């Protein structure tokens, strides 16, 4: 058995092509046939859903009580401002949480560079637009920045303390992952007389807070650590009874409208009685392609949006739908 393991090829050539400061193409070859997709898919999922980073998770704006407000002298409404805050690429050095201030008056654009920073806080995209002010406009806000991993909806951070939280502290859904886009292709590779080998090419783009090469290195480390337990696997003398968790991930109970799909894709899903994210992930690609007016472009959009939240099509949920999810809720969704 040991000799057959040693016959497996291991990658001998790694090439990193820097496309821009935030984008790189990493080529790994040669790989045994099939290992290109095995490694590429695993690394892609980790890069999209499991990379740690920092994001704005809460905003408190003077004169604003809720997100549906408008501010005099500010071109954008509060919802637009909150969406713009999500696009700030920020790094914390040595801290997991910090509160920052932004004060701006008079006509002009308000950008991420206007945020008052501590010495251990860094903003990569200082030219990122937050709002536009008129001559009589002013913007005074406090921003809470936290460290996290992957994607975290605002309601996942709710606790008993939130009930006593002052009115006007607006919670944001946070995308902590510094990875903005990742795709991979598997090409043919050749070693001597063997022509059926794989070459893995990963195209990776980040928000600038993490170098693409470092991102792929961290993803590989996470995968290695998760698989390490299998190397010295030993069976227990007595079977361990694992209690089944009835609790369902809250994100699966959210409506598909929260995925912010195009109108065409959203309407196609609703026509097939797919109202919740939990309904969607249980469908396969083949099933969705049979949906009238839903083509490959819409399917790709759906897969990318799910992947950004650590989900994919074709997943199985044993306890779906939960008892708390009533059928009449779907009728009014």
Curated annotation (Swiss-Prot):
EC numbers, comma separated: 2.7.7.6
Disulfide bond residue pairs: none
Stretches the record annotates as Alpha N-terminal domain (alpha-NTD): 1-234
Reaction equation(s) it catalyzes: RNA(n) + a ribonucleoside 5'-triphosphate = RNA(n+1) + diphosphate
GO biological process, one term: DNA-templated transcription
Nucleotidyltransferase is among the record's keywords: yes
Keywords noted in UniProt: DNA-directed RNA polymerase, Nucleotidyltransferase, Transcription, Transferase
Gene Ontology annotations for the cellular component aspect, listed alphabetically: cytoplasm; DNA-directed RNA polymerase complex
CDD domains per UniProt: RNAP_alpha_NTD
Keyword Transcription: yes
Region (Alpha C-terminal domain (alpha-CTD)): 248-333
Family, as annotated: Belongs to the RNA polymerase alpha chain family.
Name of the protein: DNA-directed RNA polymerase subunit alpha
Species of origin: Stutzerimonas stutzeri (strain A1501)
Gene symbol of the encoding locus: rpoA
């Amino acid at each position: 058995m040991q000799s057959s393991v040693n016959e497996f090829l291991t990658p001998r050539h790694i090439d990193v092509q820097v496309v821009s400061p935030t984008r790189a193409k990493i080529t790994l070859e040669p790989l045994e046939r099939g290992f290109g997709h095995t490694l590429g898919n695993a690394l892609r999922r980790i890069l999209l859903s499991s990379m740690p980073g920092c994001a704005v998770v809460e905003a408190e704006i003077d004169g604003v009580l809720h997100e549906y407000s408008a501010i005099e002298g500010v071109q954008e409404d509060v919802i637009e401002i909150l969406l713009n805050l999500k696009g700030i690429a920020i790094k914390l050095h040595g801290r997991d949480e910090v509160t920052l201030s932004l004060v701006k008056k008079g006509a002009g654009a308000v950008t991420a560079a206007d945020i008052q920073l501590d010495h251990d806080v860094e903003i990569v995209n200082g030219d990122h637009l937050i709002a536009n002010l008129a001559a009589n406009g002013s913007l005074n806000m406090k921003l809470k920045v936290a460290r996290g991993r992957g994607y975290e909806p605002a309601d996942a951070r709710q606790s008993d303390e939130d009930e006593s939280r002052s009115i006007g502290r607006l919670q944001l859904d946070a995308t902590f992952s510094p990875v903005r886009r990742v795709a991979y292709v598997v090409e043919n590779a050749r070693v001597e007389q063997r022509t059926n080998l794989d070459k893995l090419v990963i195209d990776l783009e980040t928000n600038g807070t993490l170098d693409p090469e470092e991102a792929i290195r961290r993803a590989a480390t996470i995968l290695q650590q998760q698989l390490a337990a299998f190397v010295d696997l030993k069976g227990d003398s007595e079977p361990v009874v694992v209690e089944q968790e009835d609790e369902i991930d809250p994100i699966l109970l959210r409506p598909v409208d929260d995925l912010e799909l195009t109108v065409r894709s959203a309407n196609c899903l609703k026509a097939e009685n797919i109202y919740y994210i939990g309904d969607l992930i249980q469908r396969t690609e083949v099933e969705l392609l049979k949906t009238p007016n839903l083509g490959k472009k819409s399917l790709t959009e759906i897969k990318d949006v799910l992947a950004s939240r650590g989900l994919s099509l074709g997943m199985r949920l044993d306890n779906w739908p939960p008892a708390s999810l009533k059928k009449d809720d779907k009728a009014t969704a």
